Amino acid sequence: MIMATSLLLGACNPATDVNVKETGDKNLIGKSDIRIKDGRMTPEALWAMGRIGGMNVSPDGKKVVYTVAYYSVPENKSNREVFVMNADGSDNKQITKTGFAENEAVWIKGGTKIAFLCNESGSSQLWEMNPDGTDRKILSEFDGPIEGFKFSPDEKKVLFISQIKYGQRTVDMYPDLPKATGI
C-alpha cells in the first residue's frame, strides 16, 4: 500500500529530466497541459493525463522503475516513457524521451541495469540501459515483435512472448480495413 501511494504521488509530481534521450522527433507524444474548463472533467482532459504502466522495485528495495503512457487523440496513438524514482516517492526522473514506446521495464543485473521492450529497431525488441537512461543496448534480434519477457533467476536465459500468425487475419481478408480486428 505504501509503495502504491508513493508511486502515485511520485507520478503526479513533475519529473526531473536528467539524461533524457531526445530523438529529434517533432511528433513526439509526451506530457500534455491539462485544461479543465468550467470545473468539468472532459474526455480531452482525461486523455491529456499520463497513464501509469507497470512498475518494478529494485532488488535493494530503494528504487522503483515504472512507465507512463501519453496519448494524442488527433493522431490516435500513444507513446510510453520510462521513469525512475526512490521508493519513498522522491527524486522522480524521466529517463527516456523518445518516440519508441519503451515499456515492460524491470531491474536486472542486481539493479545495475533496466531491461525493457522498445521498437527503436523497427519492431518491439528487448533492450537494456543504465538506471539513468544512458548506454542503451539491444539484447534481442527476434524476427517479429516481442510482447512480453521474463528473465530466468540467473538471468542467463529469457522467456518471451510473440504473436505467431496462424490462419487468415481480418486484415488479410479485408485489406481495405487495416484497423479491423474482428470477423
Q: What kind of feature is each model-predicted range?
A:
Residues 70-74, 120-123, 165-168:
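Short glycine/acidic-enriched loop and turn motifs that connect beta-strands
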